[in-house]
């Protein structure tokens, strides 16, 4: 339940300009999650969400990363071109790639040096990433989606 709620929170803050815990709680309640402001507050802390300025006057919740930028545009291209889909099983992230692309995509992910990823192995078209926690797995999935969408 908590994992689903965290996933929904990440989707909501990516889609809407949510500026307060009350706004987020209302959206989650409208989506069928029975949450209080206190629950939302804990979730925000656990997901390491931050408030960022929208226009100098308003703020919104966002995921911020202090990770290093991607080493090369080539890695981004490989990640974008080779990526097919991803799914999670607890703290294991499974990434499907185009046939023969898993090792290259895995190298691109390793080059990101994200602290949440403990390690990864690649086959022909599948990558398995061991991630520190379930919440970190959701964050990594969100980061990968943003990289693919923004490039």
Curated annotation (Swiss-Prot):
Signal sequence extent: none
Pathway: Amino-acid biosynthesis; L-arginine biosynthesis [regulation]
GO BP of this protein: L-arginine biosynthetic process; protein complex oligomerization; regulation of arginine biosynthetic process
The keyword Ion transport appears for this protein: no
GO molecular function: arginine binding; DNA binding; DNA-binding transcription factor activity
An annotated GO cellular component: cytoplasm
Function text: Regulates arginine biosynthesis genes.
Name of the protein described by the UniProt record: Arginine repressor
Biological source species: Lachnospira eligens (strain ATCC 27750 / DSM 3376 / VPI C15-48 / C15-B4) (Eubacterium eligens)
